[in-house]
Amino acid sequence: EYDTAMEEAFEADYDKVRSFITGTVGEIKKGLVSREFYYKQCDYMNFLHTLAMSAYPVDISLSATLLIDGKVPAGEVRYQDIRKVYPYENKLVVLRLTGAEILKYLEASYDAWINTVTEPYENAHVLKIKQSKDYSTGKMAWKLAKSPANFDSAAGINYTVDVTKPYGSRVVITDMADGSKFELDKEYTAAITTYRSVGSGGLLKAAGLEDMKSVEDRIVYRGPEFRTILYRYFKKNGSIDPAVVGDPKVVGSWKFVPEFAPAAIKADVELLYGK
């Protein structure tokens, strides 16, 4: 039997909750395209790094994509849309890493991401892809050799990744985003996700943190879910604006070198997902 008294008793509360979750919390000024991260610094990854760097005073952010090949459309964002913008329940973790450890971390990340290529470069597959059978179609198809969930890039520093160099000598960090010196023996605060903090992807182990105790000893802050951070960012700033989240004095810059590399990786991405 329908309980009208119960409905009337909670109608005001229901209306408040509905109004909140359907209410606008902010705006995406320009659509964010995730696939660009494979071959260059992009607005989408700048957005993820900026979220981490807005929640705690860190020197460096380390993050992978949340979307393998997706888009965050421009326009108003309602509270109930936050899960679409940030689809995982990751939380923020801040830990201390030396410059040398950050360098090793990035070397391991890009080793999962790219091949070392030599001349002639014209037909080289820079992105680590392979052909294997697609069991849904029965045909051969291009696939990533490794999971992009472990393709971490960094913000807060300026660096290059040379695809002609072997593992261990690809990443060159020139300086911090603000122009100050990057030092191998100095400790920095680095933002990562809970996914990464439990050892996923093996990047912290590659950096020299051999076990969970080593990681725990370095943690200086455990933050809220990134969805909460995103909500707070909207309330404070009103929008996700590529011109703001891409501020080079905050997020720094990175790129693949030599010049042919980004276009070659983009061509590999198009083999995976089409143009």
Could you say what each language-model-derived stretch is?
Residues 1-275:
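Catalytic centers of hydrolytic enzymes
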